[in-house]
């Protein structure tokens, strides 16, 4: 924002919410006479609360920069939000430990492969000195990895099989596969399944940092916690594998990729402010 003002002379005011307080802060700010012209929503759930305030971005230069419509948040034909950070998640893998167990990342191309490797590591856990998976903690700081991210896979494959992109209720076609991958996690991890209720996201990360497990389900946002000054890993030590659940074309499966947060423009703002906001957003994605 500061750089944009320096280049254009257009003032940009940024209001930063405290951690975990974005929605509360947004509600307060939107009630003011000088409400924000640019805000964010957290996917379709967030859009449901704010879509009446969202300007249709269809046909704008900003929307024209999208490489795929899958990065737009739509309501019918209207583009009400545009993703501003694309992230991927999967099984972050300690390749050094994997090789100590006698395997390479290239050996794992399916759920059957993953199961074979994980159960072999568990059988030799005492000898190897590490487990297959970090703890799948069900504490609130960790459970989103399984209640949301892991759950996306059976839902995605059901949507693909049925040729739909929304539904009021899933049929549960692949819920057994969802159970199978989670069972693999909890039965081949650093801790007994009975301990999972109290395990946290920090526990899982620290287990991985301490070389206690080969696989850590998480995403690209974890990079700075694992690699860099004072961190134990280099880029060469890590890779990320797809989360295989035994469904679909596993040989060609990639990482789960998308965005959780989307930019939205306040349609209640003046025409001049809306245009100024669109200009700023376009600059953000095109400026060097």
Where are these regions (language model features)?
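Conserved N-terminal structural module of periplasmic/extracytoplasmic solute-binding proteins
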Residues: 1-46, 62, 197, 231, ...
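Extracytoplasmic/periplasmic substrate-recognition and gating elements
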Residues: 7, 77, 99-101, 190, ...
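Short helix-initiation/N-cap motifs at beta->coil->alpha
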Residues: 16-25, 109-113, 195-210
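A structural signal for short loop-to-beta-strand junctions that line the ligand-binding cleft
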Residues: 28-29, 36-37, 63-98, 129-131, ...
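Hinge/lid segment of periplasmic solute-binding proteins
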Residues: 42-92, 145, 149-151, 237-242
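Short, solvent-exposed loop/beta-turn-alpha elements that line the ligand-binding surface or hinge
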Residues: 56-69, 133, 137-140, 155-180, ...
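Extracytoplasmic/periplasmic solute-binding protein
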Residues: 80-84, 89, 115-167, 213
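Glycine-centered hinge/linker elements that transmit conformational signals in sensory
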Residues: 118-119, 164-198
């Amino acid at each position: 924002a500061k750089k944009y003002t320096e280049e254009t002379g257009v003032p940009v005011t940024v209001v930063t919410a405290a951690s975990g307080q974005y929605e509360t802060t947004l509600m307060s700010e939107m009630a003011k006479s000088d409400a924000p012209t640019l805000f964010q929503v957290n996917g379709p759930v967030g859009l449901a609360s704010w879509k009446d305030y969202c300007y249709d971005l269809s046909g704008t230069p900003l929307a024209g920069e999208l490489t795929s419509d899958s990065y737009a948040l739509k309501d019918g034909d209207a583009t009400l939000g545009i993703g501003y950070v694309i992230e991927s998640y999967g099984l972050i893998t300690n390749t050094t430990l994997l090789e100590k167990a006698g395997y390479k990342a290239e050996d794992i191309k399916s759920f059957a492969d993953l199961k074979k490797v994980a159960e072999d590591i568990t059988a030799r856990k005492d000898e190897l000195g590490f487990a297959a998976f970090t703890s799948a903690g069900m504490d609130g700081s960790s459970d989103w990895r399984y209640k949301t991210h892991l759950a996306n896979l059976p839902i995605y494959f059901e949507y693909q099989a049925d040729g739909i992109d929304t539904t009021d209720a899933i049929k549960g076609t692949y819920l057994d596969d969802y159970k199978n991958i989670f069972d693999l996690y909890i039965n081949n991890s650093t801790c007994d399944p009975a301990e999972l209720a109290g395990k946290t996201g920090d526990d899982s990360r620290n287990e991985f940092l301490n070389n206690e497990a080969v696989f850590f389900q998480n995403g690209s946002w974890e990079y700075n916690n694992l690699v860099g000054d004072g961190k134990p890993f280099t880029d060469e030590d890590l890779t990320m594998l797809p989360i295989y659940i035994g469904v679909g074309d596993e040989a060609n499966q990639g990482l789960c990729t998308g965005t959780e947060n989307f930019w939205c423009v306040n349609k209640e703002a003046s025409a001049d402010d809306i245009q100024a906001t669109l200009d700023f957003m376009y600059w953000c994605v095109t400026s060097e």
